[in-house]
Amino acid sequence: MKSKENKYDKAYLKMAREWGNLSYCERRKVGALIVKDRMIISDGYNGTPTGMENICEDEENYTKWYVLHAEANAIMKVASSTQSCSGATLYVTLSPCKDCSKLIYQAGIVRVVYICLLYTSDAADESCRV
């Protein structure tokens, strides 16, 4: 069972990485997928809010304050649909920050799988790293 789960984890992480390539952010491209019962119910990548110019960094190459993280974008898509994150798995290319970890918990996501550890938090400790 574990090897089959690991096989799917790797496949979904590859897809999350490809999704992250859609980001307009220059410094870091992050992608996220929310999967429930082996079905992708949402996706997201880091970027500016809808209707804003797709420039994520300022003149000094710092990320602008209003840029949304991939996890937040994916969770917000589910919130505006008929789906629910309850019991789902989040696949993301970068470990969630503390604010996203709170959103993940509140959304009912029970498992987080990520590629790279950037942020450390109690929520990240509960994650499965592939």
Name these PLM-found stretches.
Residues 5-28:
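Short, basic/aromatic recognition patches
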Residues 30-38:
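Short beta-strand scaffold segments in enzyme catalytic cores
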Residues 42-44:
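Short hydrophobic alpha-helix segments
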Residues 46-66:
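A short, polar/charged loop-to-alpha-helix boundary motif
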Residues 71-94:
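Mobile, glycine- and charge-enriched loop segments
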Residues 93-106:
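Local cysteine-cluster metal-coordination motifs and their immediate loop/turn environment
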Residues 110-111:
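Short acidic/polar active-site loop segments enriched in Thr and Asp
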Residues 119-124:
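Conserved small/polar residues in nucleotide/adenosyl-binding loops
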